[in-house]
A protein has these predicted regions:
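Generic short alpha-helical segment signal, independent of protein family or function
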Residues: 10, 34, 50-54, 63
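C-terminal cap/substrate-recognition subdomain and adjoining C-terminal extension
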Residues: 56-63, 67-190
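Helix-loop "lid/cap" segments that line or gate small-molecule binding pockets
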Residues: 29-33, 41-52
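A general alpha-helix detector
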Residues: 4-5, 42-45, 64
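N-terminal short leaders/motifs
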Residues: 36-42, 116, 120
């Protein structure tokens, strides 16, 4: 969702592309060196997409994006069924740990029956230097760090579901690991 949001911002604010384009080589090299989960290169990209716009304008764009995204998001029945099963069990703590910014997650899924019943850990954004930046990039090993801050160590998790190999550091601590395929099917991981 985060990448889609930044593309959405650039489509709505095409002049920011003039700022983003010269930043892309720096961002690309930094991601190659530091890895895809690095915070500052993506923070620089977000800043380039949002620089020069008021907080009110950016909040409106965020809200507009959430409405647009809700119309295009595809629900995966198998994944929803598993989530519902865990929610109905009443003996599990359920965590949604996502690389998407928390305000986007909350706005896109605000009316779902499950959002109020899960614990959310997400990427955080804040205002700095005339735009938005990432104050926390919740991706890769950072997901482990953030969950350990909430529930302590050592992590012992029953099951984990992910659509990305970036989540393998967190899935390592799960007894049962599942990869969500692009078509919404579940593949059990070893």
């Amino acid at each position: 969702m985060f990448g889609t949001f930044m593309r959405y911002l650039l489509r709505r604010q095409p002049l920011n592309a003039l700022l983003v384009l010269p930043l892309l080589p720096v961002i690309g090299i930094a991601l190659l060196i530091k890895g895809r989960a690095a915070r500052w290169p993506m923070s620089l990209l977000l800043w380039g997409c949002t620089f020069g716009h008021s907080e009110a304008r950016l909040m409106q764009l965020q809200q507009d994006f959430a409405l647009w995204f809700r119309e295009h998001v595809i629900a995966f029945p198998v994944v929803q069924e598993r989530l519902t099963t865990y929610l109905n069990a009443n003996d599990a703590d359920i965590w949604l740990i996502t690389g998407s910014p928390q305000p986007l997650v909350e706005q896109v899924y605000f009316d779902t029956p499950w959002l109020p019943r899960v614990n959310l850990i997400a990427t955080q954004i804040g205002r700095a230097y005339g735009g938005w930046v990432l104050t926390l990039r919740c991706l890769g090993h950072e997901k482990v760090v953030q969950l350990e801050k909430k529930i302590g160590t050592p992590l012992r998790l029953y099951s984990g579901y992910s659509d990305s190999k970036q989540d393998n550091p967190l899935l390592y601590f799960c007894q049962h690991r599942w990869r969500v395929t692009p078509s919404g099917e579940l593949q059990q991981l070893e």
